[in-house]
């Protein structure tokens, strides 16, 4: 039996189809920075920037790119849902750097 809390979490996952995010890695004279902008809808936007040396997100970004490519080629709903969950976990790893 599925608990109400689990059901609610599943529903929230379903509604996250239209989240857009932009991740920028840059360099300034005093160090590296990572900027993220997330648009949940037209009215709700989150932006955050952190400054740090040696920001290591290359693996996560490569994994997101691979997941996106695989998602486009898969036509089976169950496989697409599994890829979506993996992509959300990878995005969560990236967001953990920002302390959201």
UniProtKB/Swiss-Prot annotation:
Annotated Pfam families: DUF5517
General function of this protein: This protein may be involved in virus assembly.
Listed name of the protein: Uncharacterized protein A-100
Lineage: Viruses, Viruses incertae sedis, Fuselloviridae, Alphafusellovirus
